[in-house]
């Protein structure tokens, strides 16, 4: 399980951040709140929530990133 990913922000949209850490680019789904918090930054740390969807051939592993632990905790309560 990942606690956070820290690295260079290489791509950013209001819904997705790509963070390069140790030569790997992680595509991380983000909230608009996180987008506002990291916009304009070169290096970021995103607190991660992992989601695994198992559906036969459509299995997926999705990362959700948050600028703060508090925002991640709130998301997990939903």
Identify the meaning behind each predicted range.
Residues 1-5:
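Short coil-to-beta-strand transition motifs
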Residues 7-9:
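Conserved hydrophobic positions within beta-strands
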Residues 11-78:
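Long, highly charged, low-complexity intrinsically disordered interaction regions
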